[in-house]
UniProtKB/Swiss-Prot annotation:
General function of this protein: Oxygenase that can act as both a histone lysine demethylase and a ribosomal histidine hydroxylase. Specifically demethylates 'Lys-4' (H3K4me) and 'Lys-36' (H3K36me) of histone H3, thereby playing a central role in histone code. Preferentially demethylates trimethylated H3 'Lys-4' (H3K4me3) and monomethylated H3 'Lys-4' (H3K4me1) residues, while it has weaker activity for dimethylated H3 'Lys-36' (H3K36me2). Acts as a regulator of osteoblast differentiation via its interaction with SP7/OSX by demethylating H3K4me and H3K36me, thereby inhibiting SP7/OSX-mediated promoter activation.
EC number(s) on file: 1.14.11.27, 1.14.11.79
Chain intervals with Basic and acidic residues compositional bias: 72-81
PROSITE patterns: JMJC
The protein's name: Ribosomal oxygenase 1
Domain JmjC: 250-395
Name of the gene encoding the protein in the UniProt record: Riox1
């Protein structure tokens, strides 16, 4: 069985661990400390809102198609039978694509080492001119990534990649009928569908040339006679140790593959904008005729992408309502704890399996064939309950401070008719007490800092996010593409400047969030994040009150361009100061390349 992120003994939905580099943070941070703006700034509110309305982006077009898709809706009584062809048929061979003669090992080592040194830097999308020459360019994955490189809006790129991930299942149908409700199986009959995303040769390369450690980056586990064993030796996961454990029947689970694999990073960085929630992943390599993990359920929405080999999966519905859409992962279950599976199937390369939080699952390799799959995970602790858990204490605090009814004393004799021992009492005083509680609870909604808590959750998402992946266009039109360099003993091509005539928009849609803290405004952003989870402290810029409406206009008008001279500021100096600061940080792009002065 393969354990998804944050299962029992598994890593939580994080991209990895590392020592943090601290950055000075704004003081007085509080979700109740909303920004204070001078009256002179508020006169721009109406004009800013009208500009946003005029610049509103067109809605995305959705496509419909026939699909070879199975869900478990309506299959509660008996498990889906394992197809006869899946029991006996040998896997169809995946065509081997010859490597270019130029793709020698030293070049590959040099390229990946350079990527490792720049984990937090934006990178171009696959399909651009700097992509790995060893990747199979004609695979469906590489074709869609090349297509994304030509889509100007990051929103549309995220929607397109998710559409490709589910294809031929329409995303709108998936969200309306299946998301958080049913397990879904998509069969594609195309072993090359995910080719270029991740492979066993990629894992072998990482063991040889990257600093991979047992327990931190790689787990070795097996499930024998109803017991799971984790067999992580201390220290670095060198090939000799890792492959010896694999030969001994251990599954290898690579945590945070996006920290090592540029393609996995790029895949997740695009999809995180679709979910509005952190997207993580693990990779699982299981030897033939073995099972790595015990049956369990997880606290994330799981998308299983079968990359190599074959694997038998059994998926079970939550056993009772308390396990439905679980907020925490389960302990390991025994086979006696399980009922009949609602879905039993063999995944082959190119297939996709989705199941919600709380669905128990286990998987094993059979027929002498290994299995490699990637689990994409999202929506960990991203529920209404989690949101209200943050809102209600703050609402209570505000209500006590602002409404005298919450400060009035309890009845002197309330213990005579309240409490468990009086729960069956018909005392009218008890009825009046309960009514008073209901009235006060209903009033709490007036004090709920909903927007402030939403901003704090958005700030957390910005910190959780992977750094953005840039298209060729985004790189060429932003500071990342300026031709400034050192040449002949001095820097050259220095001097490009924004003017009031320059047209700009944000680099991407989900890369920044404006948050009020301690009476000040801060713009939190992702472009300097690491591919390793929280390796860096949150990054932010202070936005002055006279620039607040202009900043909001830039955030809300994406992907439409705004002329710098039209930003709602009090002066040209404020307009240019804000635009230049954002451009220099890599947060803005221009409609045309800047002209060197």
């Amino acid at each position: 069985m393969d354990e998804l992120p944050n299962g029992n003994g598994a890593a939580p939905l994080k991209r990895g661990r590392g020592r943090r580099r601290r950055q000075p943070q704004p003081r007085g941070a509080s979700v109740l400390a909303l920004p204070l703006r001078p009256r002179k700034v508020r006169r721009h509110r109406k004009s800013a809102a009208s500009r946003v309305a005029a610049l509103r982006a067109r809605a995305l077009l959705s496509e419909d198609s026939d699909s070879n898709v199975e869900s478990v809706r309506g299959k509660r009584e008996r498990p889906a039978e394992l197809p006869e062809a899946s029991r006996s048929a040998e896997p169809r061979p995946v065509p081997v694509r010859p490597r270019p003669a130029s793709a020698t090992l030293p070049r590959r080592v040099e390229g990946r080492a350079a990527l490792s040194r720049n984990l937090g830097k934006p990178a171009p999308l696959p399909g651009s001119h700097v992509d790995d020459p060893e990747r199979p360019w004609d695979s469906p994955l590489q074709q869609v990534l090349a297509e994304l490189n030509g889509i100007p809006s990051s929103r549309r790129r995220a929607a397109r990649l998710f559409e490709w991930l589910l294809a031929p299942l329409p995303p709108d149908h998936f969200y309306r009928r299946l998301w958080e409700r049913e397990a879904v199986l998509v069969r594609r009959q195309d072993h090359s569908y995910y080719e270029g995303l991740f492979s066993t040769s990629d894992l072998d390369w990482m063991l040889r040339y990257e600093d991979v450690h047992f327990g931190q980056h790689l787990d070795a586990a097996r499930y024998i006679d109803g017991r799971r064993e984790t067999l992580n030796p201390p220290g670095r996961a060198l090939p000799a140790a890792a492959w010896s454990l694999y030969q001994a029947g251990c599954s290898l689970r690579l945590l945070c593959p996006q920290a090592f694999s540029p393609t996995v990073w790029q895949f997740l960085a695009v999809l995180q904008e679709q979910f509005g929630s952190m997207a993580g992943s693990n990779v699982y390599l299981t030897p033939p005729n073995s099972q790595g993990f015990a049956p369990h359920y997880d606290d994330i929405e799981a998308f299983v992408l079968q990359l190599e080999g074959r694997k038998l999966w059994r998926v079970y519905r939550p056993r009772d309502p308390s396990e439905e859409l679980a907020l925490t992962s389960s302990p390991n279950f025994s086979q006696e704890d399980l009922g009949e599976p609602v879905l039993q199937t063999v995944l082959e390369p190119g297939d996709l399996l989705y199941f919600p939080r709380g669905f128990i699952h286990q998987a094993e390799c059979q027929d002498g064939v290994h299995s490699l799959h990637l689990t994409l995970s999202t929506y960990q602790r991203n529920t209404w309950g989690d949101f209200l858990e943050a809102v209600l204490p703050l609402a209570m605090q505000a209500a006590i401070e602002e409404n005298v009814e919450f400060r009035r004393g309890l009845p002197r004799d309330f213990m005579d008719y309240m409490g468990a021992q009086h729960s069956d009492s018909k005392d009218p005083r008890r009825t009046a007490f309960m009514e008073k509680v209901r009235v006060l609870v209903a009033r709490l909604g007036h004090f709920a800092p909903v927007d402030a808590v939403a901003d704090q959750r958005a700030k957390d998402f910005i910190h959780d996010s992977l750094p953005p992946v840039l298209t060729d266009r985004e790189r060429a039109l932003s500071v990342h593409g300026l031709p400034i360099r050192w040449e002949a003993g001095e820097p050259v091509n220095v001097g490009a400047q924004l003017t009031t005539e320059t047209q700009v928009h944000m680099l991407q849609d989900g890369i920044a969030r404006l948050v009020g803290e301690g009476g000040r405004l801060f713009l939190y952003y992702t472009v300097e994040n690491s591919r390793v989870y929280h390796l860096e402290e949150p990054k932010c810029l202070e936005i002055y009150p006279q620039q607040a409406d202009a900043m909001e206009l830039l955030l809300r008008s994406y992907p439409e361009f705004v002329r710098v001279g039209d930003l709602p500021c009090d002066s040209v100096e404020d307009q240019l100061s804000l635009a230049t600061m954002l451009y220099d940080k890599g947060l803005l792009l221009t409609k045309t390349p800047l002209v060197l002065s």
